[in-house]
Regions:
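Alpha-helix initiation and N-capping motif
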Residues: 61, 85-89, 98, 102, ...
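Glycine-rich ThDP/TPP pyrophosphate-binding loop and its adjacent helix/strand module
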Residues: 187-388
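A short, flexible beta-alpha/helix-coil linker loop
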Residues: 73-74, 147, 254-257
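Cofactor-binding active-site loop characterized by glycine-rich and histidine/acidic residues
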Residues: 100-103, 107-243, 261-272, 277-279
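N-terminal amphipathic, basic-rich helices that act as targeting or association modules
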Residues: 2-3, 9, 20-145, 430-432
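Glycine/aspartate-rich loop-and-adjacent alpha/beta segment that forms the canonical ThDP
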Residues: 25-61, 66-68, 303-432
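Residue-level detector of short coil/turn "hinge" positions at structural boundaries
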Residues: 75, 115, 125, 282, ...
Length: 432
């Protein structure tokens, strides 16, 4: 059964009020002065004789599209995507694996075994809901809290843990901070820390794909509500709209930009309201509902492949601390965290949905959690034993052919280490 959401796609009666999904805001009422329309190149709009300043209250709020309620029940059967069993189980097992990896690697950092970590608690539904609706050939520009997308696409726990430990098998050669993953094989562009830099890059990549004859790929760009406050976000939105790029802009609005709540980040109706203002089809979705996210991204991908950019604001809650460098209880009450953990868990919602379909039970849950935990523990123990990359990796593989300036530095470093090797833990690194 085809999904139909949006102005010409909504068929759910209870969501008639949500007819702006993947479209534009309700326009404020205007009084036409004789039907005269302006001919200004900057805006073709009707003339009025009554002056009126518009604000955030001049428009209806963009509604939140959802498929499941808090208990994992389908609200309207017509919106159930009816995903096949194998895909549903892959989605759920990915969420469980991610949760176990987060728990163990977070504690690993606390024990001093890795330098840094960021968890994904509360946002797992956004990861698997979106990943399951994309083609593996679609290009991913992520921020730093989308690991579930990588797991769903086939990146292994070994690859992810090696990256966090920065050993010689780290695909990034030990050059990045932990959780800054990337994989050319899985069409995932390497993560960088500065907020929002990936947004105009993603749109540029989408523009390049658009120019490929018979293109069948789109780009999805993940970013948070904090990144949406950066100037690069506006540039990316406008770039995508004016050049009709095949891109999905996926905002994870989890309520906090480190310690800054959304109430201090913006006025108006959230991040989603910026889409219609710039001419981008927009939908706001319940990010704790993996099925709703799947539906939204599946339809958004269809639009993107027709060179119609889409903005999705996935509403969620960051259950964990921003990172291991943060203590979120200093700026939000513990009761708030507990409420969201108990009542709006994306993992729990999907598990209850699977149980009602007869795809899951308590024994399967116990076995899945055990296997996920054992995989991470075993991989972590192996990663710790591996040596760090050869020191020459600092200088190699930067240019295709090493320029004389870098060759000179390498020679100097080599002589220095020969002379002062006792001052460096060279046994911990690979050597020739």
């Amino acid at each position: 059964m085809a999904l139909r959401i949006g102005v010409s796609f909504v068929r759910l009666n209870s969501l008639r009020h949500a007819a702006r999904l993947l479209s534009t805001h309700t326009r404020p009422e205007v009084f036409n002065n004789g039907g005269s329309i302006s001919d200004f190149p900057g805006a073709r709009a009707p003339y009025v004789t009554e002056m009126k300043f518009l604000n955030e209250n001049s428009y209806d709020l963009i509604p939140i599209y959802r498929v499941m309620d808090k208990n994992g029940d389908i609200i309207d059967s017509r919106e159930d995507p009816n995903i096949d069993k194998d895909t549903l189980l892959h989605m759920y097992k990915t969420m469980v694996q991610l949760s176990q990896m987060d728990k163990i690697l977070y504690e690993s950092q606390r024990q001093g075994r890795i330098s840094f970590y960021m968890t994904n608690y509360g946002e797992e539904g956004i990861h698997v809901g979106s990943a399951s609706a994309l083609s593996h050939r679609d290009l991913v520009f992520a921020q730093y809290r989308e690991v579930g997308v990588f797991l769903y696409r086939g990146m292994t726990i070994t690859e992810l843990v090696n990256q966090c430990y920065g050993n010689y098998e780290d695909p990034g050669k030990g050059r990045q901070m932990p959780v800054h993953y990337g994989s050319k094989q899985h069409n995932i562009v390497t993560i960088s820390s500065p907020l929002a830099t990936q947004m105009p890059q993603a749109v540029g990549a989408a523009y390049a794909l658009k120019r490929v004859p018979n293109n069948d790929r789109c780009v999805i760009c993940y970013f948070g509500d904090g990144a949406a406050s950066e100037g690069d976000a506006h540039a990316a939105f406008n770039f995508a709209a004016t050049l009709d790029c095949p891109v999905i802009m996926m905002c994870r609005n989890n309520g906090y930009a480190i310690s800054t709540p959304t109430s201090e980040q913006y006025r108006g109706d959230g991040v989603a309201s910026r889409g219609p203002a710039l001419g981008i089809r927009t939908v706001r979705v319940d990010g704790t509902d993996a099925l709703a996210v799947h539906n939204a991204v599946r339809r958004a991908r269809e639009l993107a492949l027709d060179n119609k950019p889409v903005l999705i604001e996935a509403m969620s809650y960051r259950v964990g601390h921003h990172s291991t460098s943060d203590d979120s209880t200093a700026y939000r009450p513990v009761e708030e965290i507990q409420k969201w953990t108990k009542e709006e868990s994306p993992i729990q919602k999907l598990r209850l949905y699977l149980e009602r379909k007869g795809f899951w039970d308590a024994d399967a849950e116990k076995q899945c959690v055990k296997e996920a935990r054992d995989t991470v523990v075993r991989t972590m123990q192996e990663a710790e034993k591996k040596k760090r990359p050869h020191w020459k990796e600092m200088l190699e593989d930067v240019y295709y052919d090493m320029p004389p300036s870098l060759q000179k530095q390498m020679n100097q470093m080599e002589k220095h280490l020969e002379k002062h090797s006792e001052h460096y833990p060279l046994s911990q690194y690979q050597h020739e």
